[in-house]
Amino acid sequence: MGATEVLTSYCVVLCLLQMVALSSGHFTVIGSQRPILATLGGNVELNCQLSPPQQAQHMEIRWFRNRYTQPVHLYRNGKNLHGETMSKYVERTELLTDAFNEGKVILRILNVTVDDGGAYHCVFKDGEFYEEHITEVKVTATSSDIQILMHTPNIKGVMLECHSGGWFPQPHMEWRNSKGEVIQATSKFHSQDKNKLFNMSMVLFIEASSHRNVICYFQNLVTHQEQSINIVLSGELFSWKIVWIMILSTISFVMIDFCMTYCVQQQLIHEESLSTVDNDQCESDQSEGTCYKRNYPWIIIAVVPIISVFAIIGVMLFLHLEQRVTILEQHFELDTLWLEDISVILCVVIVSNINLIPLIYFRLHEHVPRFKDRSPILNKAVVFLHFIYFSIVCGTILLVHLQLRNKVSISDSLFSLYNSWLTDISMILGFLLSIFIVTTIAKSSLFNKKWCIGLCIHMKEAEATGGPCEGEEL
């Protein structure tokens, strides 16, 4: 036997052994080692093949997920058995058999949903022998629908809300400035709809005009796709600061101007009275209880507007720093609206009660003669009326509070806001009541001393002329 015949015999034996091995079902299944990305609503193809390549038409090919008995797609005896597949995959899968001769199959899944994500088992079965390969599918959805909602600017600042829906999986979201630097979000929220898609929302509360260009940024953590939208904030949105500074400055300027004018007037009257009144006589009258030597009136007069300014500043700071609701709560905007309205009302109340009402009162003293001899009674009446007025207001607040307790449940967040406001207003009214009474008494005391000096002058003139002074008034 020659060498050629020996080599030929060896090749024949090797081929026979290979055919025996193939007929006995010795093979492996290979496929993609990386996750397959599937776009939501699109189609995805999963492939696997035999190694070594061989005919697969006579084999059973099964694709399943968690349970072997619940196939996604089943091919057996040369047919696709759709009746044995999972109901949600009926008419949604196709098995591409163009490369059956090479042992390669492709499963196409149509109209991908969020539930299609996960592991898929590809099984080739030849007789009793089978092998499988596992392919992972990741479903992704990226949305370009991003909206920024800007709430009405209020006394505390500007609130921005960024919304975007239709994401999967949950994306990364953040606020950025024009330089790409991250701005800490006030809050972040997310929810899932019936299709298990994520609806994202985040809030940014800007208290100052430091961020003029704000970017709402989203990123899909699987595909690394990015979506963003920006908003440019005008400086006019923060004009509320200038408005409030102008209001407080105007109030302070008016009160200080009134104070200075009135102080100069009273000082001139004081100096004129000192030049005509015998100090010794007034001191003797003072010892008898008929006259009081007047001190410099501008000290008391100057204290009143100063108290007014500090009262306004104190009340405004108290209302603004008091945290009745957090920014994240649904009634935050309602709280800021009430804060704006009540701040204006309190400014008017403080200015009118501390300055306007006493001014009218003292003008009546000067120009209506019958008020002069009743000044002590009127002084007490003013204080009493202040007390009655604030008592009525506090009583009304208490009644409203009791009615709210009966109408609104304790767990209601709106009731908590009402209760906080009622408590704060009650404290402020008590504080203002004490301020009003003190300023009224101070001004009344000043007026009595002024009237006393006038009486001393009149008595001095009556004594010099020899006429009677009893019962006469100035």
From Swiss-Prot:
Is Phosphoprotein among this UniProt entry's keywords? no
In this entry, the parts of the chain located on the Cytoplasmic side of the membrane are: 263-298, 363-381, 442-474
Tissues in which the UniProt entry reports expression: Expressed in skin, thymus and, to a lower extent, bladder and testis.
**Membrane topology, as annotated:** Multi-pass membrane protein
Task: Report keywords, A-Z.
Answer: Disulfide bond, Glycoprotein, Immunoglobulin domain, Membrane, Repeat, Signal, Transmembrane, Transmembrane helix
Ig-like C1-type domain: which residues? Answer: 141-234
Residue limits of the Ig-like V-type domain?
A: 27-140
Q: Please name every pair of cysteines joined by a disulfide bond in this record.
A: 48-122, 162-216
Q: Name one GO cellular component term.
A: membrane
Q: Where in the cell is it found?
A: Membrane
| Listed SUPFAM superfamilies | Immunoglobulin
The chain's Extracellular topological domains, given as residue ranges, are 26-241, 320-341, 403-420
Task: Report the family membership.
Answer: Belongs to the SKINT family.
Role = May act by engaging a cell surface molecule on immature T-cells in the embryonic thymus.
What is this protein identified as? Selection and upkeep of intraepithelial T-cells protein 4
Q: Which organism is it from?
A: Mus musculus
Q: Which gene encodes it?
A: Skint4
